[in-house]
Each structure stands twice: as C-alpha cells, then as structure tokens.
Amino acid sequence: MIWHVQNENFILDSTRIFMKAFHLLLFHGSFIFPECILIFGLILLLMIDSTSDQKDRPWFYFISSTSLIISITALLFRWREEPIISFSGNFQTNNFNEIFQFLILLCSTLCIPLSVEYIECTEMAITEFLLFVLTATLGGMFLCGANDLITIFVAPECFSLCSYLLSGYTKRDVRSNEATMKYLLMGGASSSILVHGFSWLYGSSGGEIELQEIVNGLINTQMYNSPGISIALISITVGIGFKLSPAPFHQWTPDVYEGSPTPVVAFLSVTSKVAASASATRIFDIPFYFSSNEWHLLLEILAILSMILGNLIAITQTSMKRMLAYSSIGQIGYVIIGIIVGDSNDGYASMITYMLFYISMNLGTFACIVLFGLRTGTDNIRDYAGLYTKDPFLALSSALCLLSLGGLPPLAGFFGKLHLFWCGWQAGLYFLVSIGLLTSVVSIYYYLKIIKLLMTGRNQEITPYVRNYRRSPLRSNNSIELSMTVCVIASTIPGISMNPILAIAQDTLF
C-alpha cells in the first residue's frame, strides 16, 4: 500500500515536471529556435539509425549538415533583434552571444566534411560520431547564451562529455585511450574547481545565480571586495583556463591533439576555444565588475605564459598535431589580449574577428593533415618533405594556412593580429603587445620551417611516404578538399577587406 502511494506521488511529480518543461518550451522555444533545430536533427539521426542499415550513411551526413546550416540561417534572421532574457533568467539572447553561436555552428559545419573520408577509411561508427558532434555543438551554443551559474556549469559539461567520448573514439589506439584518460581526469578536476568558485560567488552575493543579479547582490551585501570574491575569481579562472588551455593549464592539450582522431582534434581545437571565450568575457566582465584590475592581471599572466611557452615549445615538436597543439596555446594568448581590452578600444570586436580568421586557418591546416595522413599513414613533420612534387594543391594549401597562422601579409591572419595588437596598444597593454609581436616572429620561424620541407624539390630529401604518395580513390575525397578550399580562401581573401567584418563584430555589445 505504501509502495503504491509512493509510486502515484512519483508519477504526479514527474507529470508536473514534464508539464512545466513543456510550458517553458512552448512559450520560450522561439528564443532557442536554432538550438531546437539541432535537437530535431539529433532525434532524426537516432530514428533513421534505428530503422535503417549502413547503406543510408549519406543521409547521416546530409541531416547533420542540413540541421547546422538551417540553424545558422535562423541565427542570421534573428540578427539585430533586441536582447531577450528567457527561461526564467537562465538564457540570454543578444548579438554578442549570437555571433559566438554562429562561430561554433560554422566550425561544426566545416568539420563534418573533414570527417567523411576519415570515418570511411577507419570504419568508425558514423551515427555516434555525428551525434557527439551535434550534442557538443548544442552544449557550446547554450554556453554562449547562458545567463546564470547553473547553466554556465551544465552547458560546458554537455560539451566536455561529448569531447571525452570523441577523443577516445578510436578505442583500439593506446595513445587515444591515454589522451582520453588524461583529458577526463583533468576535466573533472577543473569542473570541481569551477563549481567551488561558483559557490563562493553564490554565497557572497546573497544567494543569487543570475549574472547581473550577482552584481546587485554583491553591492547589497558589500562583499565585492571580500576575500571570498578573490577565491571565486582564482577558482573560476582555473576552471575556465582548462577549457581555453592557456599555459599553465595546457597539459592535456598536446596529448589529446596527438592521440585523438584528427577530425576530432580539428573540431575541439576551435569550438572549445570559441565557447570558452564567450563564457569568459561574460563571467569576468559582469560578476567580477568590481575586480577588473585583479582579473586583468591574472589574464595578462596567462597570456604572457601562453605566448612564450606555446611558441617556444612548438619549435621542438616533430609531430604536426603536437606542433599545432602548442601553436594553439600561443594563439589563445593573442585572443586573451582582446578579452583584457574588453569593450573599450574595440577589444571584443578584434577578438571576434581574429577568432573567425583562426577558425579558417586552423581548420584548413587540419584538413591538409587529414588528407596527408589518410594517404600516407604518418603525422611526422619530416615526412612532409617534397610534398609539392606529388600534390602541389595540398602543399600550397598547407603553406597558405600556415603562413596565415604565422601572421604574414597580406593573409587574413596578419590583419587579424594587426588589429588585435593595435587595440591592445591603444588600451595601454604595451608589454603584452610587445610579447605578442616577438612570439609571432618565433611562430613564423617554425611555420616557415615546415613550408620549406613541403616545397623542397631535391630527390634526396623526399621521404618514402611522399615518394609512394597516392591520391585517394574515394568520392568522399571531394568533400574534404571542398572544406579545405573554403578554409584556404577564408584564410587569405578576407584580410584585404576587413572593414565589413569589423563593423559586424563591433555591433556585438552585450
């Protein structure tokens, strides 16, 4: 009898929760319409996978890509609308959040074609791979629009769990298992530290969880200069630092880059940084408004360490993926300059512009690595020697993306860095910008070293991998080369006409 009553109570409680969730979705669903499109795509993928055989694999790519493109279209139609807070203050929709959501969707849209040939050659499960990619994208989008501490914690965990599963997708690879274990342990530790910081912020503000209400709560409790806020700031910086992977929170990055499947690395290398940057700007700028000097100092230290260590250690690497791992650590140091400058002097606009260029440069380089790896089976830098003699298009594409990453004119990377450094200089960050300029010169050195290997024409320097190089006969080869071409074009041409891009980025105040 008692069990029967408890069961009825459980059913009633579950029904109330479901009806409340349905009510929220019914009245607030339009505010998360791009996210709802991805959710619908996920459900459609699961339905088709459970009712069809492997012959319908092209449909999986089509559904995933289409849902991402429709979601991008929905975002563009919603551009310039008034800021809206929905779901009882949990989610905010404004131009600033939407441009980061657009960047995440763009990353995912470009990464799916990069994965087609790799998945077919390695015979990985296609449905689960695409499900994890779309779910991670969904988590990143919710993180960009998160407006309270609970959502800011849950959304990146959704992204992180999918990242762990993707990095360990090749279960038989020992390096992949080792990288996943390190990624999982460090990710769990960083999440606990992040929650610890949130708890201090929650208590100091008098029990507030919305970002703007936390500021009001700190004013009411007079705790905005208390030691608890300092503890919260340090803990949250450590937690977000793991997602951004600046030095010294970069230990997981080289191993995960080297051990994970290359398309997964391409996806994680850009989406995680875009989502974490969006979250960092809002967390530091709003709840820690009264501690701006402190978090500026912390981020300056992280930026200096990242730019110096990332670029210096990259010189010594022999693996292309590990080299790009340390290069990404240096690149996030440049992005942090934009976060420090903030809304004044177009800091956010320069950061967003540089991230757009970084997406194309980085994904273009990884597309070249995917193609070369599938056709030769190697990732070693010295094995790229003489690639120009066998595949001029691939060698030239690699060279352009690497030169753009290094910031050589007239490529997009040069203009992105130029505007970022100029904004930092105007804001008085002279030492930080000087370090950025010096480390950019260092990065040009190791990028040019690889380009020299690519373009060498002497027979004695051409490796057996390149000598036996063969193009892939698969038709899906067209999709990866299409993505590579798009990324190469985006790494070169937009730099010449930056004004429209900057104008759009400057319209993203929150």
From Swiss-Prot:
The chain crosses the membrane at residues 24-44, 59-79, 99-119, 124-144, 149-169, 183-203, 229-249, 295-315, 323-343, 354-374, 395-415, 418-438. NDH is composed of at least 16 different subunits, 5 of which are encoded in the nucleus. This is NAD(P)H-quinone oxidoreductase subunit 2, chloroplastic. Its EC number is 7.1.1.-. It catalyses: a plastoquinone + NADH + (n+1) H(+)(in) = a plastoquinol + NAD(+) + n H(+)(out); a plastoquinone + NADPH + (n+1) H(+)(in) = a plastoquinol + NADP(+) + n H(+)(out). It is a multi-pass membrane protein. HAMAP family: NDH1_NuoN_1. Its main location: plastid. PANTHER family: NADH DEHYDROGENASE (PTHR22773). Keywords: Chloroplast, Membrane, NAD, NADP, Plastid, Plastoquinone, Quinone, Thylakoid, Translocase, Transmembrane, Transmembrane helix, Transport. It is an enzyme of class 7 (translocase).
